[in-house]
Amino acid sequence: MAAGVAAWLPFARAAAIGWMPVASGPMPAPPRQERKRTQDALIVLNVSGTRFQTWQDTLERYPDTLLGSSERDFFYHPETQQYFFDRDPDIFRHILNFYRTGKLHYPRHECISAYDEELAFFGLIPEIIGDCCYEEYKDRRRENAERLQDDADTDNTGESALPTMTARQRVWRAFENPHTSTMALVFYYVTGFFIAVSVIANVVETVPCGSSPGHIKELPCGERYAVAFFCLDTACVMIFTVEYLLRLAAAPSRYRFVRSVMSIIDVVAILPYYIGLVMTDNEDVSGAFVTLRVFRVFRIFKFSRHSQGLRILGYTLKSCASELGFLLFSLTMAIIIFATVMFYAEKGSSASKFTSIPAAFWYTIVTMTTLGYGDMVPKTIAGKIFGSICSLSGVLVIALPVPVIVSNFSRIYHQNQRADKRRAQKKARLARIRAAKSGSANAYMQSKRNGLLSNQLQSSEDEPAFVSKSGSSFETQHHHLLHCLEKTTNHEFVDEQVFEESCMEVATVNRPSSHSPSLSSQQGVTSTCCSRRHKKSFRIPNANVSGSHRGSVQELSTIQIRCVERTPLSNSRSSLNAKMEECVKLNCEQPYVTTAIISIPTPPVTTPEGDDRPESPEYSGGNIVRVSAL
């Protein structure tokens, strides 16, 4: 009704105002209502057992992705009418929310590598992550890339040298990882010792050591004992030169090595010595030489190769380059502004030391860094006010980047700690594997020796002795099979060899002791797999039947249970674990135990005379179950 009214109402209104005449024909059919979403358009996504439901139109908003394209049909299961994905359901929640809201977020508690794998699987690019999470995502990804690179470098300079490595690669590996060999470790400690000696000598040679004969003024130790310090400096420089040349020759890329920071430090540390050897005694040149000797202090940076803390500090400063640049730029702006203000504020004072704006730079730097030497102080009230503001602003400007630097240092430090821990765990794991292999080999050889000794003792007729030896893995599995069959079928199983011996000796059916096929039933042997009952004696059915009589032998798939009347119950089971018919009466008053013959395939044994061992006789009886060991 409402639909019909809605159809002709526009025509009636138009005719009333004279826009168009009333239609003479029949009214048009009412417009069809938009088909509502039915259950057919509801898609069920099963992600590792977790069910997600969403509309098909929601997924088809992004046809370039896996869920939005027809490729998702490859994961459809008609039986369950679900799309099954063997992926992480926790990360999939965020991916499905992207289809719903159009905003992709990064879960901070998830692994960055697993998150990237899920995005790649479902066809999403990381660039669509929202602005609220993108910066943290990039930081985590950069940290993970650095960690993987460190692990790769560690693996390349691992503990074990590859047999295909050249001499050049071995030398470079020894420099980068001194713990790979004894010679590399010795050279590592020798260079560290000479670095310390060089730095100490550079400091001690400036200490006054008294006046020499003919001089009133005290001379420094470097001038009074010039020969000793020169020899010491020569020895240190020779060691540093040899190290630098070896590193240059063994470097994978000499161009990159020469441009590296540590290479420049090495050159600056040894260059003043060689310049001093070729310089003349001219006073002007001597003054320049004194200036060059200042660069010897850079030898202390060579300790960075020997100190993990210094390397972490260098990595921190490198990773905080943007923050340090912002700090330097902010300080420069503040220094220029406050130096200009202080100069004009103190310009009217006659005793003011702020003679120019560059002269006020010193006061501004000292004040903003909260040092306050007191050599330059403002005299006017305006100067004191602006000086206080300068001091407070310096605290704020310097304190802002400090937490970022500290967090980066902590992050890099913990990364190195985890890397060291992983290397230690890997080393311990390899040591355990080597020990296990060595122990297994020793145990195997010992078992072989025990087996040979046992065979020799058993073959000796003069000194018969019983020597217990542990069975092979095949025998262990065989006895375990017997134990499981006994527990499953309530039948007693006997080896075929034992059964043959018992049938051949009819008079000794009730033997005082028998060789049980189980490891645990052997005297002096303790089973580690399963414990079977040790039978002092067992009853063998149809023991009085001659061995030449050929009887019927049952297969394991058919097990007959007999009672006192010996009435066979025709019941077969294709599996030992299958349930039997309820009509089968298992608990008889006097059960008759079915005996099984366990056949272990053994190679034919040749007697000393050269004849082969005769075949095993066939045995009759309907109560015999033959079980093949294979």
From Swiss-Prot:
Post-translational modification Phosphothreonine, affected residues: T38, T602, T607
Entry keyword Cell cycle: no
Regulation of protein activity: Inhibited by 5 mM 4-aminopyridine (4-AP). Not inhibited by dendrotoxins and by tetraethylammonium (TEA). Inhibited by 10 mM flecainide and 20 mM quinidine. Inhibited by the heteropodatoxins HpTx(1), HpTx(2), and HpTx(3).
Region (S4-S5 linker): 308-321
Similarity-based family: Belongs to the potassium channel family. D (Shal) (TC 1.A.1.2) subfamily. Kv4.2/KCND2 sub-subfamily.
Domain-related comment: The transmembrane segment S4 functions as a voltage-sensor and is characterized by a series of positively charged amino acids at every third position. Channel opening and closing is effected by a conformation change that affects the position and orientation of the voltage-sensor paddle formed by S3 and S4 within the membrane. A transmembrane electric field that is positive inside would push the positively charged S4 segment outwards, thereby opening the pore, while a field that is negative inside would pull the S4 segment inwards and close the pore.
Role this protein plays: Voltage-gated potassium channel that mediates transmembrane potassium transport in excitable membranes, primarily in the brain, but also in rodent heart. Mediates the major part of the dendritic A-type current I(SA) in brain neurons. This current is activated at membrane potentials that are below the threshold for action potentials.
Name of this chain's protein: A-type voltage-gated potassium channel KCND2
Gene source species: Rattus norvegicus
